Amino acid sequence: MELKDYYAIMGVKPTDDLKTIKTAYRRLARKYHPDVSKEPDAEARFKEVAEAWEVLSDEQRRAEYDQLWQHRNDPQFNRQFQQHEGQPYNAEDFDDIFSSIFGQHGRHSHHRHAARGHDIEIEVAVFLEETLEEHQRTISYSVPVYNAFGLVEREIPRTLNVKIPAGVSNGQRIRLKGQGTPGENGGPNGDLWLVIHIAPHPLFDIVNQDLEVVLPLAPWEAALGAKVSVPTLKERILLTIPPGSQAGQRLRIKGKGLASKKHTGDLYAVIKIVMPPKPDEKTAALWQQLADAQSSFDPRQQWGKA
């Protein structure tokens, strides 16, 4: 029988760590999976990759394999190794082959090492109003179950009731320990990560911890000043508009923005001047009177100047 070069099969170096080997294995397993690959030798390559992974993924077996490979050109080793000629060779036979060549003193009892499960990440949409207080949320997600080749064999649906804390922000990650995929050989489960996505709001834009709302004003409200009703996340308030307000001007409403553990933002009302519909004869005359009274005013006086 032939002692295969498992590192060459996996396209890795003997000095590579388990993470690198695992990445290579998953890539090759997907590439040569008989249900996916169109290559004529895909099934044979797939089995070869799986065989290499089963040995190299286990610390004890990998150490034994490295010792076998180191002695592969030793004549005495070859005589003993050839005794296994013709027998099927897989990872389970590996322990027996090693023992028959080196004896029981050359190896330790075989143990599979515990491995941590995979983390799962899901997006959770939250409305702006929901960020004001802690609230309960029922979430559903799927836990993948991997086969011996590292491919997803099936998915198990799971439902959890979770608490979304007050003051969450867009992109914030919330960890639910142990709610990911199960660990292997007694290893700990992976975690579930909730990634918060603040849903777009029809009125408010988010700027860090602050909020912005467009405030439509009639020209005379901006010119003369007024008290207008403005929406916030909790209720409507009366906002005083100072005389001579300009389009684009931001009026600060303190403490009406987004809250976090350390800071509460502000709400900014951004003024937008809204003209009335096409004026009738009477209204046009009034506009003309205003124009005559302000004939010296040129809004484009500084326009285009450095």
UniProtKB/Swiss-Prot annotation:
Highest taxon of source: Bacteria
Protein's recorded name: Curved DNA-binding protein
Domain (J) ranges: 5-69
Organism for this UniProt entry: Salmonella arizonae (strain ATCC BAA-731 / CDC346-86 / RSK2980)
Keyword annotations: Chaperone, Cytoplasm, DNA-binding
One BP annotation, GO: chaperone cofactor-dependent protein refolding
Pfam families: DnaJ (PF00226), DnaJ_C (PF01556)
Gene3D superfamilies per the UniProt record, alphabetical: DnaJ domain (1.10.287.110), Single helix bin (1.20.5.460), Urease metallochaperone UreE, N-terminal domain (2.60.260.20)
